[in-house]
Amino acid sequence: MKIAIVMTLLLVAFSTASFAIEPIERAALDLVMARADSGGDAGGDAGADDEGSCKWMFQSCEPPAKCCDGWTCYKGRCNLILGR
């Protein structure tokens, strides 16, 4: 009986860890990609409010707002589109 309980707890722990890996990787990738694509501007804020410019991560947006290529407005922030 003890072995069954331990095995169940291990299964739950590994399942939880495997489900958490993808969001953690996505968040880390968003941070890296935002800095790599920003053209030397670490914050990505330069010219974001100018006409015709795109918005970067950590900048608020509305769904019709133009985020940069490969990015989408989701939950009020520009996010990288994964799986392209």
From Swiss-Prot:
Domain of life: Eukaryota
Ribosomal protein among keywords: no
Keywords tagged on the record: Amidation, Disulfide bond, Ion channel impairing toxin, Knottin, Neurotoxin, Secreted, Signal, Toxin, Voltage-gated sodium channel impairing toxin
Residues with PTM Leucine amide: L82
Gene Ontology MF: a single term: toxin activity
Disulfide bond entries: C54-C68, C61-C73, C67-C78
Summary of the tissues where the protein is detected: Expressed by the venom gland.
Residues of the propeptide: 21-35
Signal among keywords: yes
Subcellular location: Secreted
UniProt signal peptide: 1-20
First-listed, main subcellular location of the protein, grouped into a coarse class: secreted
GO cellular component: extracellular region
Cited function: Weakly nhibits voltage-gated sodium channels Nav1.7/SCN9A. High concentration of the toxin (3 uM) inhibits Nav1.7/SCN9A currents by 79%.
Domain observations: The presence of a 'disulfide through disulfide knot' structurally defines this protein as a knottin.
Similarity comment text for this entry: Belongs to the neurotoxin 10 (Hwtx-1) family.
Protein name: Mu-Sparatoxin-Hp1
Organism: Heteropoda pingtungensis
Lineage of producing organism: Eukaryota, Metazoa, Ecdysozoa, Arthropoda, Chelicerata
